[in-house]
């Protein structure tokens, strides 16, 4: 037989083998899909029950259902790895196997997997049940929602905002710190066992595509694209930042630096994530009708159900389906009126088996009106890709899922749409001033959050990669916050805090870069859909409601789920394969032009050195080596604790003796910042149990003067080696080390020896005087002539004749 025949036969055998493998894989996946649907549903339902009723019983049921699902998935993942991907040509089968071959947390040992699950549950519970108490009324302890969020959204009281901001982080962040350290270690171990560099790399894997014809995309490319688009957005953000800073100076005179960063607790919510609630303070043309329709909603007696019904109408108007009957029956759209503890953070749920729900403690505000559109956008995506196999029921990437609802929010927020649904009066007319008002409100929500999102995820990526040691987490967090976002901490935070975890998404193990990518995608989608809807005019005035053509195009993309690369899905709608920030910049172009004119005489950018507490801070310099030489000790956390305690003691003494007040200052009331390795730092003092009540620097200086010697003695230093800059030295004597027992014994012994020597010397002198006196009377050796070589018998060589001590 010829060689070509054998080659053909081998190829046929190989093709048959591949065909057999592919058919077996299809059969395996069909069986998996059937079983996974039920087990996943039971796990999701138990999780829903826990999130809407936080009890020990429900967490136990959630853990049990989750364990069953995890065990099943682990087993199926191992089986999936027996099907070589190289032998699979059907892309739908191949993408399912690729997904299932990722083992997730099941690669961990049983003990570690259980510990990780315990940590995640604990972090979620701490976040959902944490409270902060009003220092002026300690019995008033508030949950985040409702309670603390109301303060952070509405209060203009600097100090009230500060105690709420700090109280949340001290109560929640500090509890989460040790858990988050374990979480990072375990998640990294899981990611590396799944062949990723670290957990951040694992998250970025959601964007990775192995495809042909230019549709491939790498994890490293995501980092490059995010950084590149951020440099393009930054000029717009810097001008928005400068404008907001000038307006905050009007509201909080003397509290804001005209060239510095913005205090983190003044930015509209608990995290400074969205600046939406700053609109009343920053509205450019206040005489114009208010485009925040919250008051109109209240006056028209809107409630949560009406809000979601209006959102549903919007989606239906573009040809997308109604919500299911089960959605309306099973969703939690308001906070329960009973005593149940719930997770209020808005989330959309695809439990499986056609069961779609939203969980949200809705309030009658324009912000929640837009949030309802966002969450319902998730549900529309879930319903659209329900036609896909179980493993492909997901967004093309995580950013796509977040973007869908935001597309609708862009249209729903326009004055034209608000007039259509009766929230703006029919007589409302748009002009250049109302246009700027509208765009500024949009920018506070959309542009203001981008650096926040970018910086948070950049910090987490660096933490997972090991580029920030845990001993420097908070130090680096606030360095990056100041440098990238232009936001400064209102009080310094040490390494006992975990400020990132005070945000829902961090405490609950969500990737966060999705909120950055979604913002880029949503404007790309909006521009494309507006073009399909035949919109004419500026992009920011486009309302795609009632455009069935736009809805049809969107639905085609939603139905794909994860069956195709996201690059292909993006191209299907917008005509390009990559993120492009140009539509976003085009949307805000009129505002950017206006902001540059407004900021013409203002400083644009921020000085990262300024701190809100700088005026009341005292700088300390410590010179251990020069003072103690080889006996110098190491300055560490324990020494800093002693310093803070010493200052607290000085404050107690001062208030007791000078002001006749008994105030229980403790070390936590002494706030240290700007610690340098050569031992210098700043500190200030707040009242006991009230971080917003800063003790005037002058009183702290008086307290230090009163107790200066005690403080010096605690560290074996003096005024020259323990310097409080700006406080005159007390001229107290240099430190005298305490006398120890062995020195006393040594002194006594040496004293006895010296006395003995003195006595011997005295007695020797007396004897010589007697001998000299005798020789002067008669010299027995006077006849000896030494010049003739005669020996003097009075000179003895023997040692025993010498006087000894």
Swiss-Prot record:
Cofactor binding mode and count: Binds 1 zinc ion per subunit. Binds 1 Cl(-) ion per subunit.
Q: Does the keyword Transmembrane helix apply?
A: yes
* Short motif (SH2-binding): ranges: 781-785
Q: Where does substrate bind?
A: 273, 345-346, 515
Q: Where is this region: Essential for cleavage by TMPRSS11D and TMPRSS2?
A: 697-716
Where the record annotates domain Collectrin-like, the positions are 614-805
Q: Which GO terms describe its cellular component?
A: apical plasma membrane; brush border membrane; cell surface; cilium; cytoplasm; extracellular space; plasma membrane
Taking the record's annotation, the residue ranges forming a coiled coil are none
Give the record's glycosylation annotations as residue positions: 53, 90, 216, 299, 322, 546, 660, 690
Q: Does the keyword Disulfide bond apply?
A: yes
Which SUPFAM superfamilies does the UniProt entry name for this protein? Answer: Metalloproteases ('zincins'), catalytic domain
Q: Where is this region: Disordered?
A: 771-805
Catalysed reaction, written as an equation: angiotensin II + H2O = angiotensin-(1-7) + L-phenylalanine; angiotensin I + H2O = angiotensin-(1-9) + L-leucine; bradykinin(1-8) + H2O = bradykinin(1-7) + L-phenylalanine; neurotensin + H2O = neurotensin-(1-12) + L-leucine
Which regions face the Cytoplasmic side of the membrane? 762-805
Biological process, per Gene Ontology: angiotensin maturation; angiotensin-mediated drinking behavior; entry receptor-mediated virion attachment to host cell; positive regulation of cardiac muscle contraction; positive regulation of gap junction assembly; positive regulation of L-proline import across plasma membrane; regulation of cardiac conduction; tryptophan transport
Q: Which Gene3D superfamilies match?
A: 1.10.1370.30
Q: What cofactor does this one take? A: Zn(2+); chloride
Intervals of motif Endocytic sorting signal: 781-784
What is the similarity comment for this entry?
A: Belongs to the peptidase M2 family.
Subunit info here reads: Homodimer. Interacts with the catalytically active form of TMPRSS2. Interacts with SLC6A19; this interaction is essential for expression and function of SLC6A19 in intestine. Interacts with ITGA5:ITGB1. Probably interacts (via endocytic sorting signal motif) with AP2M1; the interaction is inhibited by phosphorylation of Tyr-781. Interacts (via PDZ-binding motif) with NHERF1 (via PDZ domains); the interaction may enhance ACE2 membrane residence.
Q: What protein name applies here?
A: Angiotensin-converting enzyme 2
Q: Which gene encodes it?
A: ACE2
């Amino acid at each position: 037989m010829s060689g070509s025949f054998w080659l053909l036969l081998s190829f046929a055998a190989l093709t048959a083998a591949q065909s057999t493998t592919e058919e077996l894989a299809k059969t395996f996946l069909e069986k998996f899909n059937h079983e996974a649907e039920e087990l996943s549903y039971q796990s999701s339902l138990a999780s829903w029950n826990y999130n809407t009723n936080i009890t020990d019983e429900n967490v136990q049921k959630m853990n049990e259902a989750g364990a069953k699902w995890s065990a099943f998935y682990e087993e199926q993942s191992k089986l999936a790895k027996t099907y070589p991907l190289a032998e699979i040509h059907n892309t739908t089968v191949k993408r399912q196997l690729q997904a299932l071959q990722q083992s997730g947390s099941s690669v961990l040992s049983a003990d570690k997997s259980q510990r990780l699950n315990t940590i995640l549950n604990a972090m979620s519970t701490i976040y959902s049940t944490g409270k902060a108490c009003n220092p002026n009324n300690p019995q008033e302890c508030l949950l985040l929602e409702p309670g603390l969020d109301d303060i952070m959204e509405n209060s203009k009281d600097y100090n009230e905002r500060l105690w709420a901001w700090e109280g949340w982080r001290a109560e929640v962040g500090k509890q989460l710190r040790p858990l988050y350290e374990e979480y990072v270690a375990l998640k990294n171990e899981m990611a590396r066992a799944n062949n990723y560099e670290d957990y951040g790399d694992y998250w970025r894997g959601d964007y990775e595509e192995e495809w042909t014809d230019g549709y491939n995309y790498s994890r490293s490319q995501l980092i490059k694209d995010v950084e590149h688009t951020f440099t393009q957005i930054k000029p717009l953000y810097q001008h928005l930042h400068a404008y907001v800073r000038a307006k905050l100076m009007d509201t909080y005179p003397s509290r804001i630096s005209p060239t510095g960063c913005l205090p983190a607790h003044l930015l509209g919510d608990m995290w400074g994530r969205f600046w939406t609630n700053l609109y009343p303070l920053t509205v450019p043309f206040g005489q114009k009708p208010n485009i925040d329709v919250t008051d109109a909603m209240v006056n028209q007696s809107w409630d949560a159900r009406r809000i979601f019904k209006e959102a549903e109408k919007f989606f239906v108007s573009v040809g997308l389906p109604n919500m299911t009957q089960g959605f309306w029956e099973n969703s939690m759209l308001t906070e329960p009126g009973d005593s149940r503890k719930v997770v209020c953070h808005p989330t959309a749920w695809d439990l499986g088996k056609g069961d779609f729900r939203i969980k949200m403690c809705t309030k009658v505000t324009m912000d929640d009106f837009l949030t309802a559109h966002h969450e319902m956008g998730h549900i529309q995506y879930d319903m659209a890709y329900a036609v896909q196999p179980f493993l492909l029921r997901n967004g093309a990437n995580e950013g796509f899922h977040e973007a869908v609802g935001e597309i609708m929010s862009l249209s729903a927020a326009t004055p034209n749409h608000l007039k259509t649904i009766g929230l703006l009066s029919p007589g409302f007319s748009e002009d250049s001033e109302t246009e700027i008002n509208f765009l500024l409100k949009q920018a506070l929500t959309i542009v203001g959050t981008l650096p926040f999102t970018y910086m948070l995820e950049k910090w987490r990526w660096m933490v997972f990669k090991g580029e920030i040691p845990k001993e420097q987490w908070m130090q680096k967090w606030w360095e990056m916050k100041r440098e990238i976002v232009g936001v400064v901490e209102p009080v310094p935070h040490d390494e006992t805090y975990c400020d990132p975890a005070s945000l829902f998404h961090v405490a609950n193990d969500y990737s966060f870069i999705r909120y950055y990518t979604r913002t880029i995608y949503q404007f790309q989608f909006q521009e494309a859909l507006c073009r399909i809807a035949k919109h004419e005019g500026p992009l920011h005035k486009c309302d795609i409601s009632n455009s069935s053509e736009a809805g049809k195009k969107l639905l085609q993309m939603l139905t794909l789920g994860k069956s195709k690369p996201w690059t292909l899905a993006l191209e299907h709608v917008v005509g390009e394969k990559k993120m492009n920030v140009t539509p976003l910049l085009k949307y805000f172009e009129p505002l950017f032009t206006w902001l540059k004119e407004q900021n013409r005489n203002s400083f644009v950018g921020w000085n990262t050195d300024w701190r809100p507490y700088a005026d009341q801070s005292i700088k300390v310099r410590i010179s251990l080596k020069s003072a103690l030489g080889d006996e110098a000790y190491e300055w560490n956390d324990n020494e800093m604790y002693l310093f803070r305690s010493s200052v607290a003691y000085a404050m107690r003494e001062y208030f007791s003796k000078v002001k006749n007040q008994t105030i229980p200052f403790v070390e936590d009331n002494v706030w240290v910042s700007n610690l340098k390795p050569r031992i210098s730092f700043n500190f200030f003092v707040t009242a006991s149990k009230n971080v917003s009540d800063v003790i005037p620097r002058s009183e702290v200086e008086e307290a230090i003067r009163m107790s200066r010697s005690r403080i010096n003695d605690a560290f074996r230093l003096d005024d020259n080696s323990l310097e409080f800059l700006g406080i005159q030295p007390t001229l107290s004597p240099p430190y005298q080390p305490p006398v120890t027992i062995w020195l006393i014994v040594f002194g006594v012994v040496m004293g006895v020896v010296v006395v003995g020597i003195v006595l011997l010397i005295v007695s020797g002198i007396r004897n010589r005087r007697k001998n000299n006196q005798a020789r002067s009377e008669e010299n027995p050796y006077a006849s000896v002539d030494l010049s003739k070589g005669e020996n003097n018998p009075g000179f003895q060589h023997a040692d025993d004749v010498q006087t000894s001590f």
